[in-house]
């Protein structure tokens, strides 16, 4: 993907990246199927940290018990800081009882100014 195309894509999907930036879990849910059709994905292992209750990515220093309890997800790797990596996983929006999608509580108007300097697609 060309750099200019990637920047346009990042701005168009900023809400999904912003949720990763503000989330304390390593694994962040993302309802954008377009994102997962457009960006290469990978399979990573995750576990729930017993102390904090957060979902963490399995790394080489992860303990044996946590590795045993781990589960795999198809994800998009996103750098949201200098050395902070988050992982987006596709989760469909569940329809409400009327059959429509659940509306997002995030603003989606034209005045919502964003900066793509906070994240980078891996």
UniProtKB/Swiss-Prot annotation:
Which Pfam families does UniProt cross-reference here? Sir1 (PF11603)
InterPro entries reported in the protein's UniProt record: Sir1_ORC-binding, Y'_ATP-dependent_helicase
Q: What PANTHER family is this protein classified in?
A: PTHR31583, PTHR31583:SF2
Name the UniProt record assigns to this protein: Uncharacterized protein YER189W
Native organism is Saccharomyces cerevisiae (strain ATCC 204508 / S288c)
């Amino acid at each position: 993907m060309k750099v200019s195309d990637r920047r346009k894509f990042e701005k168009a999907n900023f809400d999904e990246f912003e949720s990763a930036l503000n989330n304390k879990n390593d694994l962040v849910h993302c309802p954008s199927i377009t994102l997962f059709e457009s960006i290469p994905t990978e399979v990573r292992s995750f576990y729930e940290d017993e102390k904090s209750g957060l979902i963490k990515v399995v790394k080489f220093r992860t303990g044996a018990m946590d590795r045993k309890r781990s589960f795999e997800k198809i994800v998009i790797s996103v750098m949201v800081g200098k050395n902070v990596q988050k992982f987006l996983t596709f989760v469909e929006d569940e329809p409400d009882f009327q059959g429509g999608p659940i509306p997002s509580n995030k603003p989606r108007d034209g005045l919502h100014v964003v900066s793509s300097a906070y994240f980078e697609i891996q």
